[in-house]
């Protein structure tokens, strides 16, 4: 079925690999329940604090037009994450392990450094989002909030001891909080249903408007997260699979793909709700919505959002922001462990790995916070730069993924079919070109 892989390596996330039993000869729904869970962890990366400002600003500036961009981005994400899960299930290796085995030492070292920096960039967005949420909810000084957020490594260490199913349940709960909050706020905002439906139809207007195109690139560039591709290839292996049994492998691929697509559909709904909220409440206003604090204040200002304005809406927004940040903590930690163990085969205690990654991520945020005396606007600029770097890092994960899943020598009969390969390479090239354009425009090198 696939070529023999290096057996001296330990399994990906060894402590939870194959730890969840799947009932044999069970019905569709019972089997789906057994495979459900990893998709929630994947979906978190598609609704983290780094995506919020772009989606809401897109609605505020261009109403519902950019909903089609969110739809396209979500379809690309579903394709790549399905390939990531397939890779892990068929080979029994994660993307980091395979990349190390199949590249030279120099290339492997470069890819490892980029992957580690991507984890740090993801952490920065989570730290800033959580720190600001704590300030908004409890009036904790931002610097103190950042330090509290940094200490959440202890939370994850406790969760890992409870078992992977418990982690999945906690993340699912946090995702549900985010979904419910924004669904409620959108219902109150009374959006245009016809405008929403029309917004999902791609418009050539986007290509002819520089501001609209720039925001579109931001949405696409922030959608597929590099660390999620490493994560997906690993946590797809948490279910017990007999790789000598073709039917068992095919079943695992099928249900893991369904789980991933279901949860990414939820992420698509959340991102759509963010844009719809921006369109329904802020379109046509002169308010600045480039910061979390601006959005928080606007939701309780009846001169901006009208009669529905209330402190409750603002508080719910901050609660959702905190839930988004904390759920990212879990996935960031697991991704960091996968990357470190896979690329350099360095098995260190989880608390050491997490602490090192966390300190490196907190340091620039803390330095910014102290230097600018807790000025949220300046600190959120760092969040923007972290998202730009994730765009830079994306091809370094996507290209190996497409190559490996298209290899019949590696994947056997489960290699990408011709149409999947064509779609994957097309999506990859589009993502790379869009990200290059976004980076150049962000740096002011093109107008």
Swiss-Prot record:
Signal peptide per UniProt: none
Record keywords: Cell membrane, Ion transport, Membrane, Symport, Transmembrane, Transmembrane helix, Transport
Keyword Acyltransferase in record: no
Chief location category: membrane
Membrane topology: Multi-pass membrane protein
Stretches that traverse the bilayer: 26-48, 65-85, 108-128, 140-160, 169-189, 212-232, 264-284, 304-324, 359-379, 383-403, 426-446
Pfam families, alphabetized: Nramp
Gene Ontology biological-process entries: iron ion transmembrane transport
InterPro entries, per database record: NRAMP_fam
Cellular location(s): Cell membrane
GO MF annotation, one: metal ion binding
One Gene Ontology CC term in the entry: plasma membrane
Similarity field: Belongs to the NRAMP family.
HAMAP family, alphabetized: NRAMP (MF_00221)
Entry function: H(+)-stimulated, divalent metal cation uptake system.
Protein's recorded name: Divalent metal cation transporter MntH
Organism: Pediococcus pentosaceus (strain ATCC 25745 / CCUG 21536 / LMG 10740 / 183-1w)
UniProt lineage: Bacteria, Bacillati, Bacillota, Bacilli, Lactobacillales
